[in-house]
Amino acid sequence: MSVAEESGLSVSSNVAQCLVDERIPVIDISGYLSGDPQAVEQFAVDLRAIQEDLGFYCIVNHGVDQSLIDSAFDQIAELFALPEDVKMNHKVDFHHQGFIPNKAMILRWSKITKNEKKDLNEAWAFMRERTADDPKVVANIRHRGLNQWPEALPEFRKTLLNYQETMADLATRMLPAYALALDLPADYFDDKFSTPEYYNRCAWYPPVDVEEGQFSLSPHSDHSSMTYLPLMDVPGLQVMSPTGKWIEVEPLRGAIVVNTGEFFNRWTNGRFIATPHRVVPPTKDRYALTFFYNCNDETVADPFPSCIAPGETPKSEPMSFHDFFVTYMDGNYIYRTAEMDQD
């Protein structure tokens, strides 16, 4: 029996109307986070409706201090304002950690279009923080190396680590809602996210002229289990609706956009969608603190019991998160190839 059937709750009117109108729902999760039983059940019902339809929503009253988000935005603005030679001293490495120059990315994993133009943004990739004696660092496991921190910005590392830890805590607290939405026990994900991996992609999208078929960030679906994106006051993010319409995400201060990615889509056997989205050139500088939240590297995406019928063949082969992540990254980034130097 589903959580909706057990609770007798239906999708809230606000969410239902947003899905009909193809608008991004905004959900107050304060009741859910406080543990109010009815709020927990209602959020699970709404979450399932969203994830089977539009795949994107915004949360407010999420407990993340706005001053922390503002400080993180200030720090990444300073990061990308550094001289080019300073940034290039931290150029992205074998582990996809560090500075990613403009035009170093073509999102080829898109299911809706053939992206052929290089994206017009700069980024800096930070993975989960590790020390030199971490077993994965010692073993030189892909994408599990040491982060490259900008020495020129003394407050940057402290601010960003605080941001990452805070976002990871929020994402972990959200897991029971996803479990309940999938008719699983609330603690189902505890052992699968016991050592979660995360990828914090800080990005700068400047106002630029583009060629036909070129974007600040091409149409794509994320790799992640879940993605969390605090909004700033500059629009640019667009989400594809079920009917193929591009919906602009309103830059609502204090809100965090949430969506699921390709790995979770595999895990749910296609039930929870990985919605295509893109970034169009903004009218002024736009920055992003995208936080991709993922399960343990060793966790394998076998369909959940509620997402596959007895005897049904899974839509995808079982795959560990780490194997999936390496494949996704290598398929989208051209920073290690000669193609990067060809405009």
Write out the residue ranges for each language-model feature.
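Peripheral, non-catalytic segments flanking oxidoreductase cores
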Residues: M1-D343
